[in-house]
A protein has these predicted regions:
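Bacterial N-terminal signal peptides that target proteins for export
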Residues: 1-8
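Bacterial N-terminal signal peptides
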Residues: 8-17
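Sec/Tat signal peptide C-region and signal peptidase I cleavage site
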Residues: 18-22
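Mature extracytoplasmic or organellar-lumen-exposed domains after removal of signal/transit peptides
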Residues: 23-299
């Protein structure tokens, strides 16, 4: 059933402010209805998807390396006493990670150690398990503490290096790659548009752009396997959010703070991205693959 754009706009302001919705994605709980049985292992991807998956894994490696490079620049900026440069390097590093974040979630608990929020922990920012990107963000933007930022960055670099090694030797099933396009947009709808992602730097718009780009890269890889009509529809649906986001990007390619986003543009993004997410969710049917495999009459 197609979602009516007007209805989405009417509901947008209510859903964007719902805190429970923002936590649903973070919890990592799959929607497992009574008619679905999760497969005990990944089913090998059909041959036609393997070049697409291989290209995406190469891109994942490059994005991880780019995030690593920005974190190293962050360390150098801190050593030089340049907090402004360190903060910008953080925002760029998180952008590079968010492009692939929806797929990283597939790699076990990688995202939970690389990108946890303080809200995951009882002691919040004071909890020793609060590490990763948002620990650096807290040190840079809330505490203004270069030493804490250096320590958190060194810790994150170890986890980023571990992710790089996993990407080098592992792969994604085609079903999960396709799912990641939809999930990348859901990251925006569930946390970013409500301003719930970057609580200290307020750099949600940069991450929104990253998640849109992440979904686009998956779709671009799948384009030869999709119908001309689907490719045309998706092209138009990406153009809407792109036009809104362009209003908040400066000549250096940097995005404004979240608070600059007008209520009208926020609702427009919600409407456009909801329609895009619906179309991306339908790709599994067109490609004749699914995220959850059903096993019936299993002994």
């Amino acid at each position: 059933m197609l979602i009516n754009r007007t209805a989405v706009l009417v509901l947008a302001s209510l859903l964007l402010s719902a805190p429970g919705y923002a936590e649903k994605y973070r919890a990592g709980n799959p929607d497992t209805g009574s008619d679905v049985v999760i497969a005990k292992g990944d089913i090998p991807s059909p041959e036609k998807f393997r070049p697409v998956v291989a290209d995406y894994m190469t891109m994942m490696g490059k994005q991880t390396a780019a995030a690593e490079h920005q974190l190293q620049l962050l360390q150098k900026a801190l050593a030089a006493g340049d907090m402004a440069a360190a903060r910008q390097a953080y925002i760029q590093a998180h952008y590079d990670y968010e492009v692939i974040r929806a797929a990283v979630v597939v790699f076990g608990h990688a995202d939970r150690v690389i990108n946890p929020h303080a809200g995951y922990f009882l002691s919040r920012e004071q909890d020793p398990k609060f590490t990763g990107f948002h620990r650096i963000e807290y040190a840079l933007f809330a505490q203004n503490d270069p030493a804490a930022a250096q320590a958190a960055t060194a810790d994150l670099l170890r986890n980023i290096n571990d992710l790089k090694q996993r990407i080098d030797v592992e792969t994604l099933p085609a079903a999960k790659l396709v799912q990641s396009a939809d999930d990348s947009i859901e990251l925006i709808l569930s946390t970013k548009l409500s301003g719930d992602e970057n609580r200290y730097s307020r750099s949600e718009l940069s991450d929104i752009a990253a998640n849109i780009e992440g979904a686009r890269r998956i779709v671009s890889g799948l384009a030869p396997l999709l119908s001309a009509k689907t490719n045309e529809t998706l092209g138009k649906q990406f153009a809407g959010p792109d036009a809104v986001m362009a209003r908040y990007r400066d000549t250096r390619g940097q995005y404004a703070e979240y608070e600059k986003l007008t209520p009208e543009d926020k609702q427009q993004l919600y409407a456009d991205l909801t329609l895009l997410a619906e179309s991306l969710a339908q790709l599994r049917a067109e490609l004749k693959i699914d995220v959850y495999y059903k096993y019936r009459n299993e002994p």
